[in-house]
Curated annotation (Swiss-Prot):
Residues 1-56, 111-122, 181-263, 312-398 are cytoplasmic. Mediates zinc accumulation in roots and confers resistance to zinc. Involved in sequestration of excess zinc in the cytoplasm into vacuoles to maintain zinc homeostasis. Can also transport cadmium with a low efficiency. Disruption phenotype: No visible phenotype under normal growth condition, but hypersensitivity to elevated levels of zinc. The gene is MTP1. It comes from the Eukaryota. Residues 187-202 have a biased composition (Basic residues). It is a multi-pass membrane protein. This is Metal tolerance protein 1. It comes from Arabidopsis thaliana (Mouse-ear cress). One of its GO terms (biological process) is response to zinc ion. One of its GO terms (molecular function) is metal ion binding. Ubiquitously expressed at low levels. The chain crosses the membrane at residues 57-77, 90-110, 123-143, 160-180, 264-284, 291-311. Residues 182-232 are annotated as: Required for zinc-binding. SUPFAM superfamilies: Cation efflux protein cytoplasmic domain-like, Cation efflux protein transmembrane domain-like.
Length: 398
């Protein structure tokens, strides 16, 4: 028996007897000292700096939202305006969305553990589910109160205070739009390519190959983010170099997705604040038109619920382990079958641990004369380049 142990890999070769009837070669790679999960704690200092900047901006956005939400709750009660309270409920949904984005960035630095081998990203989904239930409860209470007021017609609304609070909200939203929009508008300007392979974060390869006298061979590959390729020839190097720029660009867009989502939330809030201002101005002008406040309440309640639909859909799809909507599994399989060395693809599974953290596993049958290592890297390169799935497990079969 011969063994070789590089820093992050372990290779064992076993020869049975004096013949080559059976040979087992196992190569494995783990992230750090723990089972590999989705921890990005090994990322370069540039990535850590960018993540820190994004977290700082989202923290400021959360604080501003909480301050303004408190002002709206107090102002809504004093003005007796359900529209303002509904806007406060909408702000709560934004706070939840910002907090989830913030947690996502924070958890990116957590280490996976032997028990939590995928890390702690699923907490993000559970937190989002709880926050949505709270938002639906508050919105339901406000809609019920609006209907009661429409029926009884006993409430009085302070239009001036309603207008003032909404105007303050518009100012806060503009500040947040400038804060978040700066990064949104410049997210494309800081990409650098490096020619050193150890900078390419495409996770490793685990290959298990069995050679029997029945000429039956299996290969397993496991990839997820930090690839130090000790290449199997020039073809592998060319494949990885070819897609490096494209993958880097996609990763850059992915890192900015949280701030872009927050930016869109703020734009929606600004429109709603303008609506409340108009309603407040109408009631300020003519207090008898207080029904405008109730109309705004019902309309904004629909908006609040509408903003959570996409959220709840994503949550259910993750919990059901559905194939993410942005990935066409049929097209992906077809792309693999178009490779001349590939005969068949089966047991194809694509799912997500949380939104944006996608995994893929499948079995790939190849031609008897094909080079298993070359096909392995070719398949992984295709999946990373075309679908930006960095956590990949492939089993090669003949």
């Amino acid at each position: 028996m011969e063994s070789s142990s590089p820093h992050h890999s372990h290779i064992v070769e076993v020869n049975v007897g004096k013949s080559d009837e059976e040979r087992i070669i196992v190569a494995s790679k783990v992230c750090g000292e723990a089972p590999c999960g989705f921890s990005d704690s090994k990322n370069a200092s540039g990535d850590a700096h960018e993540r820190s900047a994004s977290m700082r901006k989202l923290c400021i956005a959360v604080v501003l939202c909480l301050v303004f939400m408190s002002v709206e709750v107090v102002g809504g009660i004093k003005a007796n305006s359900l529209a303002i309270l509904t806007d406060a409920a909408h702000l709560l949904s934004d706070v939840a969305a910002f907090a989830i984005s913030l947690f996502s960035l924070w958890a990116a630095g957590w280490e996976a553990t032997p028990r939590q081998t995928y890390g702690f990203f699923r907490i993000e989904i559970l937190g989002a589910l709880v926050s949505i239930q709270l938002i639906w409860l508050l919105t339901g209470i406000l809609v019920y109160e609006a209907i009661i007021r429409i029926v009884t017609e006993t409430s009085e609304v302070n239009g001036f205070l309603m207008f003032l609070v909404a105007a303050f909200g518009l100012v806060v939203n503009i500040i947040m739009a400038v804060l978040l929009g700066h990064d949104h508008g410049h997210s494309h300007g800081h990409g650098h390519g490096h020619g050193h392979d150890h900078h390419n974060h495409s996770h490793g390869v685990t290959v298990t190959t069995h050679h029997h006298h029945h000429d039956h061979e299996h290969g397993h590959s496991h990839g997820h983010g930090e690839d130090k390729h000790h290449a199997h020839g020039d073809v592998t190097e060319q494949l990885l170099d070819k897609s490096k720029t494209q993958v880097a660009a996609k990763e850059k867009r992915k890192r900015n997705i949280n701030l872009q989502g927050a930016y869109l939330h703020v734009l929606g809030d600004s429109i709603q604040s303008v609506g409340v201002m108009i309603g407040g101005a109408i009631i300020w002008y003519n207090p008898e038109w207080k029904i405008v406040d109730l109309i705004c309440t019902l309309a904004f309640s629909v908006i609040v619920l509408g903003t959570t639909i996409n959220m709840i859909r994503n949550i259910l799809e993750v919990l059901m382990e559905s194939t993410p909507r942005e990935i066409d599994a049929t097209k992906l399989e077809k792309g693999l079958l178009e490779m001349e060395e590939v005969v068949a693809v089966h047991e194809l599974h694509i799912w997500a641990i949380t939104v944006g953290k996608v995994l893929l596993a499948c079995h790939v049958n190849i031609r008897p004369e094909a080079d298993a290592d070359m096909v392995l890297n070719k398949v992984i390169d295709y999946i990373r380049r075309e679908y930006n799935i960095s956590h990949v497990t492939i089993q090669i079969e003949r």
